[in-house]
Every structure is written in C-alpha cells, then in structure tokens.
Amino acid sequence: MMHFLSFCLSVASLVSYAGAASTFSPARPPALPLAVKSPYLSTWLSAGTDGGNGGYLAGQWPTFWFGQVTGWAGQIRVDNSTYTWMGAIPNTPTVNQTSFEYTSTSSVFTMRVGDMVEMKVKFLSPITPDDLRRQSLVFSYLDVDVESIDGKAHDIQVYADISAEWASGDRNAIAQWDYGVTDDGVAYHKVYRQTQLLFSENTEQAEWGEWYWATDDQDGLSYQSGPDVDVRGAFAKNGKLANSDDKNYRAISTNWPVFAFSRDLGSVKTSAGTLFSIGLAQDSAIQYSGKPEGTTVMPSLWKSYFSTATAALEFFHHDYAAAAALSKDLDDRISKDSIDAAGQDYLTITSLTVRQVFAAVQLTGTPEDPYIFMKEISSNGNMNTVDVIFPAHPIFLYTNPELLKLILKPIYEIQENGKYPNTYAMHDIGTHYPNATGHPKGDDEKMPLEECGNMVIMALAYAQKAKDNDYLSQHYPILNKWTTYLVEDSIYPANQISTDDFAGSLANQTNLALKGIIGIQAMAVISNTTGHPDDASNHSSIAKDYIARWQTLGVAHDANPPHTTLSYGANETHGLLYNLYADRELGLNLVPQSVYDMQNTFYPTVKEKYGVPLDTRHVYTKADWELFTAAVASESVRDMFHQALATWINETPTNRAFTDLYDTQTGNYPAGITFIARPVMGGAFALLIL
C-alpha cells in the first residue's frame, strides 16, 4: 500500500477534481478529522497544499496525526462498475465529492457516483463529557448511506477495509488477526501486533492493544482478510468477498494485509446504508508512579464497565443512535453558544478543536477512583504537562469541570505524596506518554513561575465553576507553597523559560510576571474562601503592590500607541498579553481597565494577514494565546482575531491537524518547528467560560 502512495496521491487527486469541486463548510481545515478519539485513535485526511489533496476523501490515504498512513479504503459498486470513495486505490475511478461539513464531533462527506447515486459518508467520534462510561471507549463510527438520485433502482454493494498499519508504527512488525461475530450480531476483524510491547510506542503509535474493525452481521455481508490488491480486487470483480481469513501472519508491509467487509445492499431505489465501528482496546493503559505504593498499572476505565473487549465493542456498535444523539446535543450547544458569543468565525474555530483536544486524553482507573492522562502530542510526548493543560483548560471547564479535576489529580498526587523534590510546581508527570513515572530527581523542564501560576489559577478556576471549595482546602498547603515562590519571583522574574519555551529564555518577561501576580491574587481569594484571612490579606496586599509596579516596569508609555513590552525596559518590543485572561476569568479585577484598553488600541497596529505575532522576536503566533487574548479584548479586536484565525483555517498550506503555532504572514509552519494536533487548542473555549 505505502509503495503506491506518492503516485496514487497525484493521480487520484486529479480524478477527484475532474468533477465539480467540493464545497467545504464552515471551512476547509488543514486536516479533516476522521476517527479522532484518543492519542492512538487519531486518523485524519490531509487537505492543505503542503502534501494534502484539498480535502477529498477519495484519492488520498488517511494518516495518523504523526503523518504515516493508517490504511483505510472504501469502494462502491453500482450496477457492476466499481468506484473508490476513500483512499488511493490504484486503477479505480473515484466518486465525485460535492461537499464536506464538520461539526464538533462529526465530519460528513457528500459524494456522487455519476448521476445515479449519492453517498453520505459520516465519521462520528462521539464526545460525552458527562458520561465517562461512553467517553472511555476508544472507538469511532463510520456511517455510509446511499441514495438513488435518478429515480431508478441500482444494484449497490459497499466495501470498506482497514490495513494492519493501524496495529503498529513499526511496519516490519508481525501483525496477527482474527475474525469473529459477537453473540449480539456484530461481525469484527481483530488486528494486533503479534509481540505486544506494553507501554511502548513506535512513531507515536501504540505497540500494544487490539484493534477492532466491525459492522453488523446481516444479510448481504461478506468478509475477507488478505493482501490489499487481492481483497480490493475481489470486490471490484465480484461485488462480494470470499468469507475467508488469511492465516499467513506477517510483517505489516509484506503484501499489506487488509481486513475488509462488503455489504450487498441489493436493488436500491430510495436509500440504504451500513455502519462500521473502529477502535482500540487496551486493558492496561498507563504506567503511573504517583501512588504511595509505587508504580501502578492503570487499567483503561472501560474495563470497569465491560468484562471483555468484544463486550465493549458490541455495546459501542449498537449504541450508535444514542451516541449520535448525545453528540448532536453537544454540537448544537457549542454551535449556539459560539455564534451567540461571537459569530460564525468563532464557531469555525471552536468546532474544529473539540475532537482534537479530547483525542489527547485517556480515561483510566475505576469509577470510584478515575484519572485522566493527557499526552502533549507532537511538541514532545510529555504527560499532563501543566503549561499544556493551562491553555487547554477552558474546554474542560465548558464541557464538564470534573474533567479538569481528573487531569490535575495525578499532578497533585505525585507532589503531595513526596515524589517530587523541588519546592515549585512540576512541569509534567512523565517524559513520554504512556509512562507517568514522574521526576523523582526533579529534573523535569524547569518553568517554575509558569507552572506555579498555572496551578494556582486553575485550582481557583475549577473550584469556582464546580462550586467545590473543599478542593481548595484539600490542596491548600501545596497551593500556599507554590504561592510563596510566586511572591519571591513574580515582580522580577529570573531568566527562565515560559510556556513558549521554543522562543527561548528571557529575564523580566512582562507577560510571565503578570501570570505570577495574578496567581498571588488568586491565592488571596483561595485563602479567604478556605478560612485563612491573614494569608488572604497578605497575598492581596502583595498582588496589588506588584501590579502597580508592573504597570511602570512593563509598559512602553512613550510608544505610539503605548503597549506592554516583551520584557521590562525593552520599549521597542511587544507581545500578546494573554496572561491578562486569568484576571477576567477568575473575576479578580486586579488589573486596571486601562491596561485592557491600551492593548485593544495596540493590537490592530501590529496585525499581520493571519493574526498578531506572539512577540517581536518572530512573525509566528500561537493560536491558543490569540484566543485567550481575544476573549478579554473589545468586540472589534476580538472579531479581528477570530476573523484572521478562521481565514487561516481555510487557507493555510499546512496539511496536518490544527497547529497552534504558525507564521502570521505565510500561514505555514515556522521554520524548524511543527506542532500538530495539540490539546492546547482547548483554549478556543476561553470566551465561552467568562
């Protein structure tokens, strides 16, 4: 399969464009989300011109977020003629895609087979923030409906397969597979790495667990596993498969084994369809060392609800109507709230981020003691990175504040159990997902002011949304310890890195200092809420003193127009003052309105085509921080940020899942830095939680 990739992409793309061009609503994203549910179930369709085909499902292989092919193919046979509707199958004409639409949870392609048949191909990755049982299932749906559009009956067969490329990032690894039918009528192919490597990755893919590709065991179903050319060719020739299972277990790249279903829909004069499910079952999900007893194997949360993987699969597949309804409820809520808050450009942004963010987390543990672990994705594989959770946290507060609590839980647990030696807040709980083995030597990436501020701010943000003051009391000692660091370092931050570590270290960072000062005032509120009035008075007094001094140290008063600086005294510099957001989020009113007004006047003077640069060191920007900045800006400046980012989504040449770091002039990746599919884009929801 892979050896045909480059040739097929170029040829098949031309075929796709041979018909009328597809429309894209509300935009044509850089990559179109297909099955996007977890760090390992994350398959996309590249669209941007730097390697994508413009967003046409037929003519290009779907890929894992990291870029390698996860073979997924679809064919349709109409009156004995075969067409490709997904993938880059050689020597097969493609359907004509007429439209694409995305919501927060689904991607829908509309296609035509000549003037005879219309197809609707829907990829649904359900998101149920209030239902952890459903959310714990690492599965996604593919729903294919066909309809005669010429008033005539047509004989139609629908085909879809996956390749063994899903089972391992090592294409030389031996794959093994099996076929079965559950007691409740779900037919499935099970595919897995023959030698399981627990808690191991290869090119970011999981090297353990079992993949399931399933459909209903109904009349007209046939199945087959075998070499890609043989199996796809059998369908094209016969309109059905051999009901045979290839037992020659082999390397993924040896004659590319695929696992296929065909459904004969018979003579279709109106409409008919078929449903597929794809997903990953891992009994053991995470290795975690935060508990007092030491390193613990954390089970996937779904294990508490289902006795076997096939039972989970069976439930998921038969749950389609309910899952689709719940997902539509979320789609509709996000749509209404986004449009009411800031219009269509804002919805274009928010709805594209949802699956991406939730696909960075894994639910583990038990219903009585659940945990959420997050993978940083692409920038590195760090786990529960505090300065990644911080920009992401608005989406969790919007969908269900308890989710943020569960993400922060292991961070507190490791430090409160004495497994981290530094007095400031840790950066992450493990160097590479899925191994949350901590940093017992304190040798994690050092961002002391950044992470202390983030943890204090998020503690109060969660408690306010969840009305959970007991949470603040529970963690008061460590929050107070972190605030001591903020008091010592915030007004004159030492030479250190902030969350924007790729930009380098710097002393006296104006925006970083602001985070620390706001963190101190947040602790004053926490102290007051938890019955520590002396601490509250002390922290508030310090924060007010610092913010008054900060307005002298960090503002270029003589500039035209005035603005905050990147670092103290560097009046020719500037940057996004995104840490201002927490003042408004927490209702602190620590920062004078004049600072907000000053920045509102300034930002339009430095806007580039696709947004406002992060700071004066580069022309690139961070989309998450633009959205934090926009959330507390005036209406006109807010809309300026949203319009630029929505335009970027539609025009960027990048061809991977929504990047948060891009060049504001070209829309491309900055030289040498490629961020992909990161959960930080949960920051798109910053406006919706104010």
Curated annotation (Swiss-Prot):
Activity regulation info: Activity is inhibited by about 80% in the presence of 18% sodium chloride.
Temperature dependence: Optimum temperature is 37-45 degrees Celsius.
Signal sequence interval, chain numbering: 1-20
Keyword annotations from UniProtKB, A to Z: Glycoprotein, Hydrolase, Secreted, Signal
One Pfam family named in its UniProt record: DUF5127
GO cellular component, one term: extracellular region
GO-annotated biological processes: carbohydrate metabolic process
Location(s) in or outside the cell: Secreted
Applications: In the fermentation of soy sauce, the traditional Japanese seasoning, glutaminase is one of the most important enzymes in flavor enhancement as it converts glutamine to glutamic acid.
Glycosylation sites: N80, N96, N435, N508, N528, N538, N571
Transmembrane segments: none
Stated pH dependence: Optimum pH is 9.0.
Main localization of the protein described in the UniProt heading: secreted
EC number, UniProt record: 3.5.1.2
GO molecular function, one term: glutaminase activity
Catalysis performed (reactions): L-glutamine + H2O = L-glutamate + NH4(+)
PANTHER family per record: GLUTAMINASE A, GLUTAMINASE A-RELATED
Family: Belongs to the fungal glutaminase gtaA family.
Function as written in the Swiss-Prot or TrEMBL entry: Glutaminase catalyzes the hydrolysis of glutamine to glutamic acid and plays a key role in nitrogen metabolism. Catalyzes the hydrolysis not only of L-glutamine but also of D-glutamine.
Protein name: Glutaminase A
